[in-house]
Amino acid sequence: MSSSEGNSDASAPGTPVKSSTPSSRGSSPDSPKKQEPSKKRAILNESDDDDDSRPAPRQLSDSSDDNIHPRGGGEKSSPGAGGGLFGDLSGSSDDDSDREGKPKESNTRARLSDSDAESRGSLNDLQGIVMANPDEIDEDEKAKEHVHDTEMVTGRVTLEYAADPPHFVRMPNFLSVATHPFDPQHYEEDEDDEQAKLDDEGRTRLKLRVENTLRWRVRKDENGKEIRESNAKIVKWDDGTMSLYLGNEIFEVSLVPLNSNNLPHLYVKQPTLMSAQAVLTHRMTFRPHSTDSQTHRKVTLNMADRSRKNAQVKVMDDVGQNPEITRRENARKEEESLRAHIRRTQMVRNNFKVRGPRYAGQYSDDEDMPTSSRKGKKKEAPIIGASSESEDDHADTTKKSGSDSDSDEEYRKRKQQQKKQIVTSDEESD
């Protein structure tokens, strides 16, 4: 009776849930039925951390089997009456959660698969540019990537630098670098000049013998150890500036930082690959120290020669007469033709004056007509650039002019005599 009353008291309304479930305090260790709920409660406490495994709230259905009797009822409840209300709920919570969780997960997966199929079908129906899912692209790229592992034998090259890191240098046209070591026995300056005429970029370099060529050699010190020497050195001053001493020439050195987005690298070439050794962050430039240096004079002279316009010389293959002589001859011929034309016009005018209407019948046909009626003629000026032949022609013309003057005098005398005869005959007739 005590056990049944205890169960009926636990199943009374208004009592807490913890009191309804049998615990290990009021039960004996020999009853296995009272120990099972405690184990199931422990499982429920462990599943509280997982949100997905939490059981859904269960609705109690009103049935004739689950009637709740008051504490003072005359009917005795069976030992499992209280457990039908609360014990079964706590005892079967895990089973119910498993049964309800699996259908929900299957339903959600079915819905996702249906939505993916619908979205893919809608994408296939679209036309134009379709934005792809980046997750799908990554999966496709990973599937396409094939990594090939190959074995290669290469030499490990390590370069030793000074305290300062290496710099990028673009050599100007007035500086050269000899890559091979200097050997005075096999050195030939002429061959070196021919090799340094053009640089890698096709520019003509200024060769100043040994003044602007960086050289190095290998020699042994007192202990017999090989050391390297050079004819150039860089001096860093207190103010931070640097100078390059190359023989007797001095050049100013300046460092300029390079663009950080595109930095050049120093590589060592090997048969199958190129191994990077350092990153070059600064560029080094050189310029002559003063205008009195031999390098600066050489540079300025070279620029002046390129800017100077040389006179164009025409080469004549056919050698003929002197053009100056031919020009003078042509001028003389033109002058002679002009003088001859003037003489002809003057003679025509003079003849017209002599043969006037008054004296037309006074002359016979056999009588020679005077060539000119001028009392005197001006002496002709000598022709410019006249030759010996022209002088002979001039002498002939002077003789002819002399004979013409004589004929004119005879003509005047003859005319005066005729006038006298006419006058005397008129007087006699009177």
UniProtKB/Swiss-Prot annotation:
Residues 326-347, 409-429 form a coiled coil. GO terms for cellular component: Cdc73/Paf1 complex; cytoplasm; nucleus. Residues 1-128, 349-430 are annotated as: Disordered. Keywords: Activator, Coiled coil, Cytoplasm, Nucleus, Transcription, Transcription regulation. InterPro entries: Leo1 (IPR007149). Residues 1-10 have a biased composition (Polar residues). The keyword Nucleus applies. Disruption phenotype: RNAi-mediated knock-down is maternal effect embryonic lethal. Embryogenesis proceeds more slowly, with embryos displaying defects in the positioning and shape of epidermal cells. It comes from the Eukaryota. GO terms for biological process: positive regulation of transcription elongation by RNA polymerase II; transcription elongation by RNA polymerase II. It holds the Pfam family Leo1. Residues 18-30 have a biased composition (Low complexity). It is found in: Nucleus; Cytoplasm. Residues 99-119 have a biased composition (Basic and acidic residues). GO terms for molecular function: RNA polymerase II C-terminal domain phosphoserine binding. Component of the PAF1 complex which is a multifunctional complex involved in transcription initiation via genetic interactions with TATA-binding proteins, elongation and transcription-coupled histone modification. Component of the PAF1 complex which consists of at least cdc-73, ctr-9, leo-1, pafo-1 and rtfo-1. Belongs to the LEO1 family. This is RNA polymerase-associated protein LEO1. The lineage of its organism: Eukaryota, Metazoa, Ecdysozoa, Nematoda, Chromadorea.
